[in-house]
Design a protein with these regions (language model features):
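Generic amphipathic alpha-helical segments used as scaffolds and interaction surfaces in large
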Residues: 19, 152-155, 272
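Short alpha-helical basic/polar micro-motif
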Residues: 30, 58, 181, 209-214
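Switch/coupling sub-region of P-loop NTPases
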Residues: 39-49, 57-191
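Conserved P-loop NTPase
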Residues: 185-271
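Terminal-proximal interaction/regulatory segments of ATP-powered molecular machines
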Residues: 259-297
Length: 297
């Protein structure tokens, strides 16, 4: 399906409402807007149930550009028939995509091949708890797809970046360190006293790259922001890797910084104006892009 601002469930919570309730702030949301718009992979992690992982993921997916194909994974039943690179990415489902497409029942929904330049994979949860969740070989192929340019949004039960790495790098999924470096954004969500939710830490996982001589260059993950429980506020550190983040959006560092500030201010204005409804926020995001096409890529 083409992305039109979200699934619109009965009670969707917008990113502006999450800012208003303190889950994250406008500065981090403005940064994530730029990075999600560039289709960076994004994992939302939380250890406790009902913390709001899916709520945060869906709210941030509203930042995907118009025309993005959102490809929901089908859990244990996922066959990647729509993914041309599936076999190259290690899918052991047997034959190539042409054979699998040809053998689908005539009554099956028409399958359109995915294009990495415009497709964002979505896994409601990375785990083996339910058949609708994504785990094992399916999870491995989905993360590997990020190396081919596909976006990926998912949630996972984990309380830290280290736990995310341990789960996805463990024997059941079996991702290598280089493959884990494609996770992009890892956002850790926690419950706080009183029943609130806070984005406790935001990480940018730097992809392994090779220099001109073919040598592997590994840089550790960078912290974008962390929550200070004393002040009940986020401390921001993303400016320390500003050039790297700007490069992911094909912008110069100065342009990226200015655009992040504009978007953060815009979101703060929506909070101040009480514009928090899902459809209102989706329309406001579209309106921002329409009024400033140079700032929305």
């Amino acid at each position: 399906m083409r992305y039109d601002g979200g699934r619109s469930p009965a009670r969707s919570i917008s990113v502006v409402e999450l800012i208003a309730t303190g889950t994250l702030d406008a500065e981090l949301a403005g940064l994530l807007w730029l990075l999600v718009e560039a289709r960076l992979p994004m994992i939302v992690a939380a250890a406790a149930p009902r913390t709001g992982k899916s709520t945060l993921l869906e709210a941030l997916l509203a930042f995907l550009p118009a025309g993005t194909r959102r490809q929901e994974l089908s859990g244990f039943a996922e066959d990647f028939v729509w993914l041309p690179e599936a076999a190259e990415l290690g899918w052991q489902g047997g034959r190539d995509a042409d054979d699998r497409l040809r053998d689908r029942p005539a009554t099956a929904e028409r399958v359109t091949r995915a294009d990495p330049a415009s497709t964002y994979l979505v896994a409601p949860e990375l785990s083996d708890h339910l058949p609708t969740y994504t785990w094992g070989e399916q999870a491995r192929v989905a993360v590997r797809a990020a190396s081919r340019g596909y976006g990926l949004g998912a949630t996972i039960h984990a309380d830290s970046l280290g736990e995310v790495f341990a789960l996805l790098g463990g024997p059941e999924v079996g991702l290598t360190a280089e493959e884990l470096s494609r996770l992009g954004l890892v956002l850790v969500l926690r419950l706080v006293p009183g029943g609130g939710r806070r984005l406790a830490a935001g990480h940018y996982v730097r992809p392994v790259v090779r220099d001109a001589g073919g040598h592997i260059q590994r840089l550790g993950p960078a912290v974008l922001a962390t929550w200070d429980p004393v002040r009940d506020a986020l401390d921001h550190f993303w400016w320390g890797i500003l050039p790297e983040l700007a490069e992911r959006t094909s912008r110069r560092a100065g342009d990226f910084e200015a655009e992040q500030a504009r978007r953060a201010s815009y979101l703060a204005g929506l909070v101040a104006g009480g514009l928090t409804g899902w459809q209102e926020v989706v329309a406001a995001i579209a309106g921002y892009r329409a009024s400033d096409p140079a700032g929305a890529r």
